[in-house]
């Protein structure tokens, strides 16, 4: 198997640069790494956008151990998130040339991607000859279709595609891919959910169009993807659906049937499950920007609640309690300080 640069991994790393910078607020760190970020984006634009329309359409190696061909929402959403992050990073480091380049590419690419891939319900892969390449998903509903949106939320840049389309896509993933039993689900590789268990499969074809050799992991249940979808659902206002997905994971890894501290994909303690941290941030509505000196909470849960939180300069407990008929917010710092940080309502 020829290992080529991973499209999702490289572009996801660009998004993480901005996420980590905002958590640290260290401009020197950003200035030091910025030239490498520019090189990574130059490679992406040259290697994966073959026709120059700011939508990826080349051979795109991914975490599914295969290459996607043609426009597809999974890698392209990460590309859009990377462009948006780079637009903001370029402004911070004073790189006006690249700031304008990335701003224009994002605006053009987002509009084109939405036009090409949104089918009125969710985002699909665009392929004229779906069976030309093995392991594609075509018109199928991929749970991972808006992985880039998940990364965008974690980086605090909001929606990268029309908000109503993002919500529709996530509702569709829950509608078509969430299973309340696995008696009739084909899983020709590994069975991570069985019998009466609940979970979300990687892909389905509710409107037909399943390729002759489809995405090989389509019938599997990956907790890392489930957490990602849960986060996107919560940010889209579908809190109940998001928590339903999370509960299904915890019910499967309950300490009786499976180890609750080792969520399995390709082996024990698989790192994709660390996407679970995003659920905490989504439920808190936490936005941390140490560069701009702001911290805000907009909880998705109404009513009284209490939760751990962490940002670049402190960690502690956020709570909201009803006092004299009014919901009041409280922040208890257990380590660090927020003295120079503006906590926004």
Give residue spans per PLM region.
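Short, solvent-exposed positions on alpha-helices
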Residues: 27-32, 97-100, 104, 240-244
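Glycine- and acidic
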Residues: 1-2, 18-27, 62-67, 210-215, ...
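Aromatic-rich carbohydrate-recognition surfaces in CAZymes
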Residues: 1-55, 70-90, 103, 145-152, ...
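Extended glycan-interaction surfaces of carbohydrate-active proteins
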Residues: 1-4, 47-71, 111-222, 254-255
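N-terminal leader/propeptide and maturation segments of large enzyme subunits in energy/redox metabolism
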Residues: 85-102, 166, 176, 180, ...
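Short amphipathic alpha-helical coiled-coil/interface segments
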Residues: 102-113, 246-249
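Alpha-helix N-cap/helix-initiation motif
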Residues: 2-6, 26-34, 68-75, 95, ...
